[in-house]
Curated annotation (Swiss-Prot):
Region (Disordered): 79-111, 149-181, 215-255, 272-315, 508-565
Keywords for this protein: Antiport, Calcium, Calcium transport, Glycoprotein, Ion transport, Membrane, Potassium, Potassium transport, Repeat, Sodium, Sodium transport, Symport, Transmembrane, Transmembrane helix, Transport
Cytoplasmic side stretches: 216-330, 397-402, 455-458, 742-756, 817-822, 874-881
Glycosylation: residue positions: 69, 514, 551
Subcellular location(s) of the protein: Membrane
GO biological process, one term: intracellular calcium ion homeostasis
Biased segments, Low complexity type: 149-175, 228-240, 542-551
Protein name: Sodium/potassium/calcium exchanger Nckx30C
């Protein structure tokens, strides 16, 4: 450090104007900074003008004094040291070059070095004063611009035409949002801010470039007006210490180095932000709350932080993670992803092995019909993970992860599940129009109502109640489903000709038994009844129409397609450990194919014999095949080996038809749709293969606690404790859903993925895996209507129960509407409604048959929906709503 020399009175008189002017400039800047910290914008403008004039005078006086000074030394004085700090050692002097210049001019090298050093000190201090003034001026301009933008946005938000636009936070927008117009700000006037913001940025870069030695110096820790940064060593210091003016030096670790503490060192500080939006949740907890207007809706005392889409976002109530942010970015997030997948398996096990069987006992105790039970209890059993995910999203994580999960799960169930059923079904399944029409009608109504309620990004309690009322209406409709279906079909088929072609005309030769026109149903009496199609012509009153009846959902009879599905629901645990394989149900014997063709197809009426006197009505008969004995083969989904008696024909038929049926008594193997009488209880036995043993070990940490705490209602002893299983299953589902959402949020934050996107893709697919497996198994058994109805029916439960119940509880408890923050979610729901229309149109185009072409079409629609929804979420496509 260079030592000051003794000054003469003449030299001090020459330096006095510069010293006094610099002191005035420093005092003006300090007063300006304090007014800026107090947010006194009225006095800030006047102080800015005064400080600017003082800075200009100081710069002029300093330059004049330096030019008049011709002595060999530039003296130090106490006044000069109080007016400006000595510069850091970063402003080094090239003594060799200056020594050469000094020798040419006749000056001593040491005197010349001190002269240049002190000139640089004064000039740099004036430059710093000017820099602060420029930055404060830019801050004032930015604050005024943001205030006007917020005022325009709030005014526009009150208008009906632009009610969807929400105002930005009163504490200001983040620097990232201001400097990057691609940021998802809800402000409608963001485009008009681009030019002044870029101009401000250019000026800031220019003023930062004036300090040549500042770029190499380490930046001090960021400080915020009105609050402290947890990364700073002095968290409790007052902001006046940080803004202590020109005369308060901040010493560094170097012995002879000093550093000027600039009040604004980054873009966020330049614009006067009180909160850093890139901080962790722990850092946000130390921030000072904003205005009373912003905190009016925050009734739980949770600190607000700025969000891209809404005015306030509450801190999630999740515990602190075991890993730091750096560790998560370096690979620890993989453990969270594995944990989320593990929770998918846990939810599937508790729903399939404990929750659904307990619901089956409740249905049996209450005597509820299959239609109502399928729409209520069984739908709740399959959609329990989505319901609890929505509850956690509203009350714990305070985001739209529940909405994203339910919307994504709905699309997954409609498109992906139906596509998988069409691809992996053994035969081409025929669908009945009534169940699809019924479920899609209620689902369309619920989606349209939900889109209308999302128009202002808020859900009130009465809106949630209306959504739940739609579900009550759906359950009431299912109570009289058979009567309504019969009435509607009578109205449609009244005085109309309905022709069902002969089944053997619909199939190529040699593949008759593989037709989906023929359905088999096991009768209680131990017989297999094969149903044939019919041809009906309108005739005069009193004509006998012996229409075919049965349990199958086809033709003109009632469908009766909605069943509880509990008997068909094979758990994920059984698929992983036990012997069930959904893709290998056993082979059908070729002889059974031939006999099945004879028994069910050749009896059909290929042509009706006209009679004199008008139109005739002819109907197909039932071919009743009595079973002598029935033995199950030793296979997982075994075939039925049986011996047939002579067939008997029921109904009045002409003798010329009886001659067409030639069935010989022979032993054959026939495959019929399986209906399990009693579900098997959970088996904890040690598996016999290495793969199953490995799976058993992996799921044992989940399975053993549930097996110890939840009675198995599929056993006679555990059936008495079904309330314990029911309540305990709900507790386990809530715990697993909490862990799933927590770890998914951590993984999404680490990968910079919004919660809505995580719910729309990853969580939606994971929570729908059990329904996918069940639907594929049901479709391979030949129940296409049940597979489609269960997919659409679970979506009705999700939208009308999974979403409104948490919203209704929130409105009752806190008396405030639920804020819906996602911009693209409204458009995603709209596209979901369009996809539902496309599904119905696709099924109609494929003539109500589930074939592989329909499956590939469903896959194409699913990936198109996901792609468009992601573009809405990331503002690649602007959502017009």
């Amino acid at each position: 450090m260079l030592q000051p020399t003794t000054c003469s009175k003449q030299q001090q008189q020459r330096q006095q104007p510069a010293i006094a002017t610099a002191a005035v400039g420093g005092a003006a800047v300090q007063e300006l900074l304090r007014k800026a910290a107090a947010k006194d914008h009225g006095a800030l403008a006047a102080a800015t003008a005064t400080a600017t004039a003082a800075s200009t005078t100081a710069t002029t006086a300093t330059a004049a004094t330096a030019s008049r000074n011709s002595s060999n030394t530039w003296c130090h004085s106490d006044d000069m040291l109080s007016a400006g700090r000595s510069r850091s050692s970063s402003t080094t002097i090239d003594f060799n070059s200056r020594r050469r210049r000094g020798r040419l001019r006749g000056h001593a090298p040491s005197d010349l070095a001190m002269n240049k050093q002190h000139q640089a000190t004064i000039l740099d201090e004036c430059v710093n004063i000017f820099k602060r003034l420029v930055l404060l001026t830019l801050k004032t301009i930015s604050a005024t611009t943001i205030t006007k933008a917020k005022t325009r946005s709030r005014t526009a938000a009150q208008l009906p035409a632009t009610s969807a636009a929400s105002a930005t936070s009163s504490r200001g927008a983040s620097a990232e949002q201001l400097l990057h117009p691609s940021s998802r700000s809800r402000c409608r006037s963001r485009r008009c801010l681009r030019l002044p913001i870029y101009s401000i940025l250019l000026l800031c870069l220019t003023t930062q470039g004036l300090g040549l030695g500042d770029a190499a110096k380490p930046r001090p820790a960021k400080q915020h007006f009105g609050g402290s940064n947890s990364n700073s060593p002095n968290q409790n210091q007052n902001h006046n210490d940080v803004l202590g003016g020109v005369g308060a030096p901040s010493q560094t670790s170097g012995e002879d180095e000093a550093e000027i503490m600039y009040p604004f060192q980054s873009g966020e500080q330049m614009f006067g932000l009180e909160e850093d939006q890139e901080q962790d949740p722990e850092l946000n907890s130390n921030a000072v709350p904003g205005s009373d207007e912003d905190n009016a809706g925050n009734q739980r005392g949770i600190n607000d932080t700025h969000n891209d889409n809404s005015t306030t976002t509450k801190t999630p109530l999740f515990p602190k993670d075991l890993f730091t942010k750096e560790q998560l970015e370096n690979g620890a997030v993989i453990l969270h992803i594995i944990g989320v997948i593990y929770m998918f398996v846990a939810l599937a096990i508790v729903c399939d092995e404990f929750f659904v069987p307990s619901l089956d006992v409740i249905i049996e105790k209450l005597g509820i019909t299959d239609d109502v039970a399928g729409a209520t209890f069984m739908a709740a059993g399959g959609s329990a993970p989505e319901l609890f995910t929505s509850v956690i999203g509203v009350f714990v994580s305070f985001d739209d992860v529940g909405i994203g999960t339910i919307v994504g799960s709905a699309v997954f169930n409609i498109l992906f599940v139906i596509g998988m059923c069409a691809l992996f079904s053994k035969t081409v399944l025929s669908l009945t129009w009534w169940p699809l029409f019924r479920d899609c009608s209620f689902y369309s109504i619920s989606l349209l109502v939900l889109i209308y309620f999302f128009r202002d990004n808020r859900i009130f309690w009465w809106e949630a109640l209306i959504l739940f009322t739609i579900y009550i209406g759906y359950v009431a409709f299912m109570k009289w489903n058979v009567q309504v279906e019969t009435c509607v079909k009578k109205m449609i088929t009244k005085n109309k000709v309905t022709r069902v072609r002969s089944t053997d005309q619909l199939m190529p030769a040699g593949n008759a038994a593989n037709s989906s026109e023929t359905s088999m149903a096991t009768q209680p009496g131990g017989s297999v009844t094969s149903r044939a199609a019919s041809e009906t012509r309108s005739g005069p009153p009193g004509s006998s129409n012996a229409g075919a009846t049965g349990n199958s959902s086809g033709g003109g009879g009632t469908s009766g397609s909605t069943q509880t599905g509990a008997k068909f629901r094979h758990g994920l645990l059984q698929l992983m450990i036990h012997t069930i394989d959904p893709l290998h149900d056993g082979k059908v014997d070729e002889k059974a194919t031939q006999l099945h063709a004879i028994a069910s197809l050749k009896v059909l009426l290929d042509a009706t014999k006209p009679q004199r006197g008008g139109a005739t009505t002819s109907a197909a008969n039932h071919v009743k095949i009595n079973l002598k004995e029935t033995t199950l083969a030793d296979r997982p989904n075994g075939n039925i080996d049986t011996t047939l008696d002579s067939p008997s024909l029921s109904g009045r038929r002409p003798s010329w038809i009886e001659q067409r049926v030639k069935i010989q008594t022979r032993k054959f193997s026939i495959k019929a749709p399986e209906i399990e009488d009693e579900p098997e209880p959970l088996s904890m036995a040690w598996p016999d293969t290495a793969r199953k043993r490995l799976t058993y070990v992996l799921v044992a940490p989940l399975l053993v606690p549930m097996w110890l705490t939840l009675p198995d209602t599929r056993t006679p002893r555990g059936k008495r404790f079904f309330p314990v299983t029911f309540i305990g299953s709900i507790v386990w589902i809530a715990a697993f859903s909490y862990l799933m959402v927590w770890w998914a949020n951590v993984a999404g934050d680490t990968a910079r993925i919004p919660p809505e996107v995580m719910g729309l893709t990853f969580l939606a697919a994971g929570t729908s895996i059990p329904d996918l497996i069940t639907s594929v198994i049901v479709a391979r058994k030949g129940f296409g209507d049940m597979a489609v109805s269960s997919s659409v029916g679970s979506n009705i439960f999700d939208v009308t129960v999974g979403l409104p119940i948490p919203w209704l509880l929130y409105g009752i408890i806190y008396g405030a509407p639920v804020e819906v923050n996602s911009v693209g979610m409204v458009c995603s729901i709209t596209i979901l409604f369009m996809m539902l229309v496309f599904v119905v149109m696709s099924i109609a185009c494929f003539r109500w048959r589930m074939n592989k072409g329909l499956g590939f079409t469903m896959f194409l629609l699913y990936f198109a929906f996901v792609a468009v929804s992601l573009m809405f979420e990331y503002d690649v496509i602007t959502c017009p709503f």
